[in-house]
Amino acid sequence: MNILTFGPNGSGKGTQGSLVKKKYNLAHIESGAIFREHIGGGTELGMKAKGYIDKGELVPDEITIPMILETLKAKGGNGWLLDGFPRNMVQAEKLWEALQKEGMKLDYVIEILLDRQIAKDRIMGRRLCANDPNHPNNIFIDAIKPNGDKCRVCGGDLKTRSDDQDEDAINKRHDIYYDTNTGTLAAAYFYKKLAGEGKTKYIELEGAGSIDSIKETLLSQLD
């Protein structure tokens, strides 16, 4: 089973992806990690990418997509779940073409729907436990709301990440994601159109629900 996921930062996309990965024993492949692995490993593609990154430039799709395909083939023997790519319409088209050329099927595309303001609130509401960063706390999500200013799990002190409080940075990321003309949602709709043609399956999930309710709905729609 091969899956592509879409959802704004704050939608719980990573959480649901991890749950699906565990249930179906998929390789959870995140685009940022691919860059780190290739650069850290000193691969030819990684060094080319590093040259652009060091100059503060975007890595061209002609480098990024081969890196992704190489990783999918190397780690996705039992299936894969790709997170964080494509981020725009052009990348969506190029990735689809590359998958077709390699004979790699795309079984499902998952989109988690979430209002932009709710997504922003969730990001800014994140709190990190000083004892264990894996203890989820968020002042805007009832199920994981902290106990006052203490961790809901262990009672430890809480802190915030500086980038979670940077409204300008959050808005810029969301400007790209919610752009239905050329941005990430345009990419998602490209695959939705393919699903309408029977070339893949498209699952839409309402992200405002609880983690468990979203999980149940998602798993019920996966074969």
Swiss-Prot record:
Localization annotation: Cytoplasm
Residues that, per the record, bind ATP: 10-15, 126, 209
Pfam families hit by this protein: ADK (PF00406)
EC number: 2.7.4.3
InterPro entries in the cross-refs: Adenylat/UMP-CMP_kin (IPR000850), Adenylat_kinase_CS (IPR033690), P-loop_NTPase (IPR027417)
Domain of life: Bacteria
Molecular function terms, GO-annotated: adenylate kinase activity; ATP binding
Chain spans, region LID: 125-164
Keywords tagged on the record: ATP-binding, Cytoplasm, Kinase, Nucleotide biosynthesis, Nucleotide-binding, Transferase
Gene3D superfamilies reported in the protein's UniProt record: P-loop containing nucleotide triphosphate hydrolases
Binding site for AMP: 31, 36, 57-59, 84-87, 91, 161, 173
BP term (GO), one: AMP salvage
PROSITE patterns xrefs: ADENYLATE_KINASE (PS00113)
Spans annotated as NMP: 30-59
Catalytic activity line of the entry: AMP + ATP = 2 ADP
GO cellular component terms, semicolon-separated: cytoplasm
Protein's pathway: Purine metabolism; AMP biosynthesis via salvage pathway; AMP from ADP: step 1/1
Domain notes per entry: Consists of three domains, a large central CORE domain and two small peripheral domains, NMPbind and LID, which undergo movements during catalysis. The LID domain closes over the site of phosphoryl transfer upon ATP binding. Assembling and dissambling the active center during each catalytic cycle provides an effective means to prevent ATP hydrolysis.
Subunit structure: Monomer.
Function recorded in the entry: Catalyzes the reversible transfer of the terminal phosphate group between ATP and AMP. Plays an important role in cellular energy homeostasis and in adenine nucleotide metabolism.
Similarity comment: Belongs to the adenylate kinase family.
HAMAP family: Adenylate_kinase_Adk (MF_00235)
Name of the molecule in the record: Adenylate kinase
